[in-house]
Amino acid sequence: MIINHNMSAMFAQRTLGVTNNAIGKDME
């Protein structure tokens, strides 16, 4: 359970990073 939670947390963090990158490129 803990490992699964860590994996989903990492996945969410990565998804947020990609989204922020896309937004930053859109703004430029």
Swiss-Prot record:
Coiled coil: none
Broad class of the protein's primary localization: periplasm
Keyword rRNA-binding: no
GO cellular component labels: periplasmic flagellum
Protein's cellular compartments: Periplasmic flagellum; Periplasm
UniProt KW Signal keyword: no
Keywords: Bacterial flagellum, Periplasm
Family: Belongs to the bacterial flagellin family.
Entry function: Component of the core of the flagella.
Subunit structure: The flagellum consists of an outer layer composed of repeating units of FlaA around a core that contains several antigenically related polypeptides.
Protein name from the UniProt record: Flagellar filament 34 kDa core protein
Organism: Treponema phagedenis
